[in-house]
Amino acid sequence: MVGPHKRKSMINITDLRGLVLKSTKIEEAVEFYENLWGLKNIDSWQGDSAFFEATGDEGFILGLVPDNQRGIETIRFALGSPEDVDTSFAELKASGQKLLDEPDRLPIPGEYYGFHLQDLDGTKIELSATSKTKKNNGEDPFAPQRLSHLVVNSPDNVALKDFYLNCLGLKLADWYKGDLFFFLRCNQQHHVLGVERSDNSSLNHVAFHVEDLDAMMRRIGVMSNAGHKPIWGPGRHGPGNNCFCYFEGPDGFVLEFTSELIEVADGEEW
């Protein structure tokens, strides 16, 4: 793969759309996310995979595909329009990035138009747009509303950070202990992606946004009553200032309920 170019990327990612995970215990995981974590299984989707929506307007925020080894299948980022998809594809192709396919209707639930590429650690990235949003499902006011952010581990997190900044147009929002941990954003939310130095490439954790601290405490109660005790929290982070509580899912993925993540205005020095 050609390394990150130094010129400023014209790609304008607007949000973290979702995450698809490889699951080694998909039946247990489906029951967990639907009955305990507060997501809604999209029953209309056929096949061995499972897809879940939150109460927000995104078609689905989490997908599970069966595999004999757990890990990230796809990180999904949003672009503003089909035209943005086409221009982003053209820019990445011209810069020599490894593209896995060309822009097209994606074979996933919803009406998404996009394409895929790989980051420097080989993780598949989706850049997509959609004109269709679902009606807000307000049945449970304490359920997750959307994905907040995810954190990945990387043996060369500096290079991976530079890839997302220079190739995909994310912005550096914060860092922790020098180059140990970088926080990247694409909008005013403090971060949508964290990149942590590690001895391997993997998912560190994925965070689900709930309405407020009260909603987070209620989700903790649901989990605790079902015998799932927090592995960390509840508490409040320094970088981002968000409240948090972490649990372990059936596959061993670390999952976070979070809220109150600070917003950063463009051009703000802090």
Regions found by a protein language model. Give the residues of each.
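N-terminal beta-strand motif that seeds the catalytic metal site of vicinal oxygen chelate
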Residues: 2-27, 72-77, 130-158, 171, ...
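Core segments of cupin and vicinal oxygen chelate
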Residues: 11-59, 106, 113, 152-191, ...
